[in-house]
Amino acid sequence: MAKKSCEKHKNFNYYCEECQSLNQVSEARFNYSLLKKTRRYKKFLLLIAIIVVVVILLAVFWLWPSWFGNINLQSQLYDSKAGGLDYFDFFFLNFWSTNFLFNKTALIGAFIGSIIMSLPPERNLLTLIGTKLRFGKPSYWKSLIVWWTFGFILFYFLGLLLNANSGGFAWTLYLIENGEIQLSPNLIFDAFNVIFNANNTDYVTVYIYSNLIVPIVSFVFGIIIFRLILNIVKNVYLRRNDYLVIGNILVIIGLLCGLGFVFLPTLSLDGINVIQILGLIFGFFSFISLGVLIYLFGKAQYKKDIKNYIFSRSKQKKIIYVVVITVVFVISPLIISIGPLLNLNNSAVWTEQQWLKKYSREIEWTRACAGLDMFEERPIGNFTESSTTSDALMVSQIRQFDQNFAVQYLAASIGSTFEGLADSDIIYIDNKEYWVAPKTVRFSEITGDAVQTNTELYDHVEGFLAMDTFTGNLVNVTQEFNISENYPIFFGESESQRYLEQTLGYYEEGSLGAYDSDIILGTEWALGIPNNEFRYEGEPDGTLYGLEGFWKTLNIGLFAYAFQTEHQYLIHRNVRSRVENILLPQLRIDNDPYLVFNMNLGKMYYAVSVYTYINVGAYAQYPILRFLGVSLVDVLSGEMTFYKNPTLETSNDPTLPLWEIYLDKYTWQDTNLPANEWLKDQLRYPEDLFELQLEANYIYHVQNSVSWRRADDFHERPEDGDLFYIESDLGDGIEYVGLDLVEYKGLTATLLAGMYVIRHGDHFGEAIFYYTRDSGESLVGPTTARETYRSEATQDISLISGARHGNTLLYPLGGSIYYYVPTYSTAGSLQQLKLAGLVEAFNREVGYGENAQEAYNDLNLTGTVVPSNISLSYNFEMESTMTFPNDPAHFIIELQNLDNNFSAPGLQVKVNLSIYTSTVITNNLNLTYDLILPPYLYPKNFTYVDVPNTVTNFTVVDTPLYFGEGLVLNGFVNTTIGGIIIFYKWTLIVNGAIFYTSPENLISVY
C-alpha cells in the first residue's frame, strides 16, 4: 500500500515529520506480533553469545598471555640486568603511551569527540545510515546514546592520533605529571610571543605548545570540520538547501585558516611572514562570520517559504560579491607584504625583514639546541704550527688501511663456516689504534631452523679479530688487550653490511641477523658445536610460566619445549635492541656500537652510546642533541651499566628541563672516577650524533649577515666523505681524534673549507674547526688531492690490478699539511696495499711509494745540511720492515771522498745511527737494540732519555777518508722484541761538524 505524502513532497519522505504524521494511523493497521520472529532473534542472539564467548576465550587463553609474556620478560630483564629500571613505567608512561591499547591519551580523544558530537547531538550521520537501512531518523536521546557508546569507541581509536607526533603528546603529559615542566595558564600567549619578540628564546614553552596544544586544537578542529561535512551531506543529499551548504563550507574554510594560525609558533617566520599571518586571522573571523550569517539567513528564508532553498541567479551574484570582498579583505596582508618582498634586494630591508627576524634567530636557536657551542674555531695554520710530533712518529701513526681492506682481511682469518664478522670499528687503546671486528654467527647458514636460531646450539661465538691500522697485520689479542682469544660473545651484533656485501654479494636491509632471535635456555643443545668451549652460565633474562611460557615458546617454533612448566629465555641479545628497548621517548642510540676492554679484569663489553633527539620547532632547525653517556653491555651475561658523558654540561643549558628527566630515570655511573679511567680512555664520541651536529654547523657556524647573504662560507662533505677516526697531533702530542673534511658548498673548484676534529681522552667532547677562509693560499680539497695523486702516479697505478683508492686522510707533516691516499689491489681473494701517496694541500707536491714511509721519503724533505766546500758523497739506506728475531733490518752506508787534490788533508768522518722509541715501551718491555756488523767493527753506543723517547746512539763509522778513498758498509739492526715500531735517523759528522742529518724514519718490527 502506497504511503501518503504531505504537500511539500510528491512522494512519501521518511525524514519529513508531516509525512510521517499522516501515516501513523494508517501504519497501525499493518502492525503484527513480533512473536513470529522470535526464533530468528533467538538464533541471532545465540550466535552473538557464541562469538562473545569465543572472543573472551581467545583473549584470556591466547591474546593476553601471548602479548603480556613479552612485556613480562622485558620487565624482568631490565629489572635484574639494567640496575632495576622499571620497564612498565618506561613502556606505558603511566598509561599515557599509545604502546598499550588502553591509555589516557586515547581517552582524551574519546571525551573530546563525544562532547563535540553531543552539543547538540549530531543526527545527520545516523540519518544517512537510517536512509540506507530504512529505520528512519533517530531521536535526540537515541543519538546521544549512540555518540556516547559507539561514538566513544570510535573517537577513542581516533584519539590515538593525538600521539602521532612521534609520541610527543604522551611524553609531554608524562613530563608535566612528573613535575619536569610546568603547564602555564599563559602558555598560548607565551608561545605567540616567541614570534613577535626577537629576544625570546623560550624553548620549553614552544616545545609544550607544539606537542600538547597543537594536537588538541587540531583534533578539536578536525571533529568540528567532520561535523560540518555531515551537515553539507545532509543539505545536499537529504534535504537540499544551498544556503546551508555554502554557509558550512565558509565556516570550514575559516576553521582551516584558524588551524594554520595555530601552527604559527612552531614555524620559523621572517618579518614578511609576520605581516602575512594577519591574513589567517582575518580569514578565521571573516569566513566563519560570513558562513554563520549565510547559514542563519538560509534558515530564516526556509521558514518563510519551504520552497526557498535554492539560490536564484540574483542571490548567487550577491553571494559571489560578498565572498569576493571577503577574500580581498583576507588577502590584504599578502598584498601589503608585496612591497617589502620586492625590496629584499635592498640590504637594509633584507637585514630588517629576514636577517634580524629569521636567520639570526635560527642561528641562535639552532646553535643552542644542537649544542654547537662545542665547536672552537682555529685557523688552519694552527694545525701545523701547534704540532710537536716528529715526522717519523707521525708517519708511523698514519692509518694506511681502511675499513674495506680490514673487513676482507679479517674475514679471511675466520676459521669456521658458521662464523661471520660484525661491524669493524677503530679502537684506541694504550695509545695505539686498531681495526677490531667481533665475530658473530653467520645467520645465513642457520636461518630457517628453530633449533639452530632459538636454542643454545648457536647462541654465541668465541673471540674477535684485530688488525694494526699501520702495518695491516693481525695482532695477538691476548697480548694487546689482555683478552683470551676464545672469549665468548653471548650478546653481540649481526653481520655487518660491508661483510655481507663482500662475502655474499648482497645485503637485505631489515632482515633478521645474528643475535636478533630470542633463545630458550636449558635445552640439550648447549655445547653442540665442537669448536666451542663455553656455554651460557649467567642468569636468564626472564622466566615465564604457564600459558605465557607456552605461547612464547610456540611462537619461536619450539613446540617440543612448549609444555614445560618453566621456561627461561635470553631476549634482545643484539646489543642495539637490548639498549634501544629501554630508552625513554626522544632518546636514540648510536648505530655503531664498539668494543671496550677492561684490561685489568680481562673483561670485554659493548659500548652503546645514548643521546637526545628532541624536536622543538619554531626557529630551531635541528633537535636538541646531547650526548648523555654509554650503556656497557657485558658480552658474557648481558648486564647493562650506564656511564655518564664525562663532559656533560647541565648548569647553564636553557634546554635542560626537557632532558633532565633522563639523568634521573637511569642509574648513571660517574665516568670521571679513578676506577673508570680505563673506560674514559677508550670512550668515543657518538658518530651519528657528531654527524648531525656537523650537518648543523656546516650552515649555522656563520653568524655574520654579510657572509650569510653571500652564502660563501657554507660547507658540505666532499665525495666519499665520512667521519674518520685517526691519530693526529693538535698541540698536545699524538691523540685519538675523529676527522671530517669539508669543502665550500656549491663550488666546482672543490677547495678545502676546513677540517672538523672531535677529540677524546682528556679532551673528550671538544670539537675544533680548522678553517681556511682567512688563509693567504687556497687549499685543495680531498677530491682534487686524489686527482692530483692519480695524475702524478698514473703509470704506477695503471699497473695495479683492480686499483682502488682508500680513505683520503689529512696529517701534519714537514711543517705543512698532507693528504694521504692509499691504493689497493683488489684482484684475487685479498686486497693488498700497492701504492701510497702524500699530496701537499697548498702546492699539490706529490710523493708516492709502496707505503706511507716510502711516500714520505719520496717527498725528499731532507734534514739539515751545513753549507761546506767539502767534497764528500754519501748514501744511507735502511729497510723499513724486519721480523724478530730471524730477519733483521738490513742497512747500507756508502761514503766517498771526491777531493781531487792529492795534497789535501784527509776527512775525519763519523756516522752515527740513533735508534729510539718511547720510554714507556723501552722500560716496560726491556727493549734493547743490536747492530750486526763485520767482526772487526766494534761500534760505540750509549743510551739517553730525550722525552718522551729513550734513544740509543751507535757510532757505526769513525775513520779518516783521504782523496779518492771510500767505503761501503753493510749491516743489520735487530731488537729484543717484536710487534713494535722503532725510529731512527742518520747523522754524518765531518771534521767534528754535523754535515748531514737525515729525516726521521721508522722500522716496523713484526
How would you describe each model-predicted region?
Residues 870, 935, 994-1006:
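Short beta-strand elements
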Residues 894-900, 923:
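Asparagine-centered strand-capping/turn motif at beta-strand->loop junctions
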Residues 881-887, 962-963:
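Short, solvent-exposed loop/linker segments at the N-terminal edge
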Residues 10-14, 23:
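Cys/His-rich microdomains that often coordinate metals
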Residues 887-891, 967:
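Structural beta-strand segments of beta-rich domains
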Residues 866-884, 898, 948-954:
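Short, compositionally biased P/S/T/A/G/V-rich stretches that sit at domain boundaries
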